[in-house]
Amino acid sequence: MRFARNPNLVAAEMDGDMVMMSIEHGTYFGLTGIAPQIWEALEQPKSAGELVQELLPQFDVAADVLRSDIDAFLNDMHQNGLLHRP
C-alpha cells in the first residue's frame, strides 16, 4: 500500500525540523527526529517497504526498527489527514 502527501499542505524546514500547515483546516503540525526525512522521501507516493529501502542507508538502525518507526509515522500522518492513499 502506497502513501502520498496531502497536496493541501504548506511545509517548510526550520532548523532540521519540518513545520506544516493544513490549508483546509488551518492547523499546524511539526515533524522532528526521522519524520522530516520520511516526509521528504514521500515526494512521490511510496510504500513503507520502499521507504525503508531508501532511508536505511541514512541511519544506524536495524531495518525492523526503522520499519516500525515508518509504520507509526505513516499511520499517524494518515489518521491526521496529512497523507492519503492514492
Regions found by a protein language model. Give the residues of each.
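Long, low-complexity, charged/polar intrinsically disordered regions in eukaryotic proteins
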Residues: 1-18
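Long, charge-rich, low-complexity alpha-helical segments
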Residues: 14, 27-86
